[in-house]
From Swiss-Prot:
Subunit structure: The cytochrome bc1 complex contains 11 subunits: 3 respiratory subunits (MT-CYB, CYC1 and UQCRFS1), 2 core proteins (UQCRC1 and UQCRC2) and 6 low-molecular weight proteins (UQCRH/QCR6, UQCRB/QCR7, UQCRQ/QCR8, UQCR10/QCR9, UQCR11/QCR10 and a cleavage product of UQCRFS1). This cytochrome bc1 complex then forms a dimer.
Location in the cell: Mitochondrion inner membrane
Designated gene of the protein: MT-CYB
Cofactor(s) of this protein: heme b
Primary residence: mitochondrion
Organism for this UniProt entry: Sorex raddei
Protein's recorded name: Cytochrome b
Role summary: Component of the ubiquinol-cytochrome c reductase complex (complex III or cytochrome b-c1 complex) that is part of the mitochondrial respiratory chain. The b-c1 complex mediates electron transfer from ubiquinol to cytochrome c. Contributes to the generation of a proton gradient across the mitochondrial membrane that is then used for ATP synthesis.
Taxonomic lineage from the root: Eukaryota, Metazoa, Chordata, Craniata, Vertebrata
Length: 379
């Protein structure tokens, strides 16, 4: 008798995705982050659902409803901090997942890569709107500053901003719609992740060498299920340690002050995972230029496959490209640091240099270096 998991209409989808999936035998722990992102999404949806049961999206009561969750709801503080710090873990996994894709040439799977870029945008939008919901000082002013950037769009800018606000400033209408979008987007992200997996399973996984691995495949279960479980346990260990020992480590103290439109905080800055993009935005003195640079800092990922000039897919055997990759990582860490600093000397010039280097590395230096490495192979 044929196994039920191979014949049942639903079970065979699960079987071909997570059990009998042929996987390369040499994929390293850098390939764990896909499953970790899935776990992060599940954690965020579950904790978010329980938070939504107690949260009110009204300017008069939003802040106090979050306080009520932390003080009066059973384990409300735990749910709230799991959700807030779960977002940080989500972004850590995202950045490592994207970095892995860049290093090992996974971007050569165009459909999978482009849906991944779309997913990154969707998660960033969700996180931004979620940050507005507690209605603290940084929530309000962050929303004001970021939505205001759209006014830089010629002709329709100011109308667009008022349309998004639902009035003439960030107010009740804005908060209500942000809550609605923040609730629906994770489900859209889950659907997109399904499509992301669908396209990945059309081609099969890449591997560290970047060479075809059809001749050497192993079943996903038990090898990679066990490996993924180890990753999940480490993720949960990191998240619970953060939540139980220093839940406010990555937050902003200003967000414990209720939103006040009449009092601007001295330093408006987003959560740590947006700081690199915020630094790029601030490094250009022109408003429209800054907005374009901000959008391009993420959109540039969609261009990466077309800038691949190397004869080899992975960077495993390309030491010069490896050096440039780690310079890019250091540059992004520098931008993250600059994004959290005040706009004054020497931070302004450091931010501008780091922003220029970011775009130069991806658009010019890395493709030229790849061509140089191709010529090295001839010698």
């Amino acid at each position: 008798m044929t196994n039920l998991r191979k014949t049942h209409p639903l079970m065979k989808i699960v079987n071909s995705s997570f059990i009998d999936l042929p996987a390369p035998s040499n994929i390293s722990s850098w390939w764990n982050f896909g499953s970790l992102l899935g776990i992060c999404l599940i954690i965020q949806i579950l904790t978010g659902l329980f938070l939504a049961m107690h949260y009110t999206s009204d300017t008069x009561t939003a802040f106090s409803s979050v306080t009520h969750i932390c003080r009066d709801v059973n384990y409300g503080w735990l749910i709230r901090y799991l959700h807030a710090n779960g977002a940080s873990m989500f972004f850590i996994c995202l950045f490592l997942h994207v970095g892995r894709g860049l290093y090992y040439g996974s971007y050569m799977y165009l459909e999978t890569w482009n849906i991944g870029v779309l997913l990154l945008f969707a998660v960033m939008a969700t996180a931004f709107m979620g940050y507005v919901l507690p209605w603290g000082q940084m929530s309000f002013w962050g929303a004001t500053v970021i939505t205001n950037l759209l006014s830089a769009i010629p002709y329709i800018g100011s109308d667009l901003v008022e349309w998004i606000w639902g009035g003439f400033s960030v107010d009740k209408a804005t908060l209500t719609r942000f809550f609605a979008f923040h609730f629906i987007l994770p489900f859209i992200i889950a659907a997109l992740a399904g499509v992301h997996l669908l396209f990945l399973h059309e081609t099969g996984s890449n591997n560290p060498s970047g060479l075809p691995s059809d001749a050497d495949k192993i079943p996903f279960h038990p090898y990679y299920t066990i490996k993924d479980i180890l990753g999940v346990l480490l993720l949960i260990l990191a998240l619970t340690s953060l939540v139980l020992f220093s839940p406010d480590l990555l937050g902003d103290p200003d967000n414990y002050t209720p939103a006040n439109p009449l009092n601007t905080p001295p330093h408006i800055k987003p959560e740590w995972y947006f700081l690199f993009a915020y630094a790029i935005l601030r490094s250009i003195p022109n408003k429209l230029g800054g907005v374009l640079a901000l959008a391009l800092s993420i959109l540039i990922l969609a261009v990466v496959p077309f800038l691949h000039t190397s004869k080899q897919r992975s960077m495993m055997f390309r030491p010069f490209s490896q050096c440039l990759f780690w310079i890019l990582v250091a540059d992004l860490l520098t931008l993250t640091w600059i994004g959290g600093q005040p706009v004054e000397h020497p931070f302004i010039i450091i931010g501008q240099l780091a922003s220029i280097l970011y775009f130069l590395l991806i658009l010019v230096i890395m493709p030229i270096t790849s061509l140089f490495e191709n010529n090295l192979l001839k010698w």
